[in-house]
């Protein structure tokens, strides 16, 4: 049987959740001979190689693995997988996401029903449990993104990706590469179709000093690629996406209680909100601190660039 579908999953230092991600992908209702999973390890330093070896031996479907010895970045990892793919339909799944058994079938059906080039997208739902991810009592729709293309849960034909030019590897190590590719896909006239039955579950571990520190570091890295993204697309749409307007800065200040909430006490405030029966307020406060870290990173890069230009003069 010919492989129809290639699942593209880049990963870095997510060994525990990666094992569950691959277990879920190997348990799809789609015939195991009809799809493959390609995992590209972006220079992990944890137990990822051992997890990949065990998953490859245990899975019903074919799992192919590649390793980037140095941290080449997520755009480069996805591009490597796309070039190596044998399936014409590419489905993007992140390594901290878990797919219900009907997930791939829903994506395949979406494309079979359309004769045109399309992007199929589905909901991304938060789950707090790795043991019973699809029944987690804290689950709720997380991704309300209206971006044209997002790699959290999307599928399209490999030939279309090649025509659009793949992901921009200069957006290293990650950040904005999906939006950037989305602009090119939109220019090609590609339609989007939203399938509610193609949901995927995104694992969010409980907030802790370790996970919060990792989230802050992620925002700092995202900020590093923002100037390059804006340089490529200096539009008002991108200005809004990057939260670079005075209104966004004011809104963030309000969200952080005019500086009362900061990285040093955000977790304590989130715990208070949980005790008061308002966990949503806690998440809102934490999100404000994370956004402030991103905005500070972008502002620092911009100031550094202005200083360099003055020195050059």
Which sequence ranges carry the predicted segments?
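N-proximal low-complexity "stem/linker" segments adjacent to membrane-targeting elements
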Residues: 1-27
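Cell-envelope/extracellular polymer assembly enzymes that use nucleotide-activated donors
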Residues: 3-6, 36, 180
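A conserved acidic beta->alpha catalytic loop
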Residues: 24, 41-50, 70, 94-97
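Glycine-rich, basic loop-to-helix element that forms the pyrophosphate-binding segment
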Residues: 68-85
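Short aromatic/hydrophobic "clamp" motif used to bind/position activated sugar donors
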Residues: 90
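Conserved donor NDP-sugar-binding/catalytic core segment of glycosyltransferases
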Residues: 98-133
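A short, conserved alpha-helix in the catalytic core of glycosyltransferases
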Residues: 153-156, 160-165, 171-199
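Catalytic core of nucleotide-sugar-dependent glycosyltransferases
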Residues: 200, 210-238, 288-303
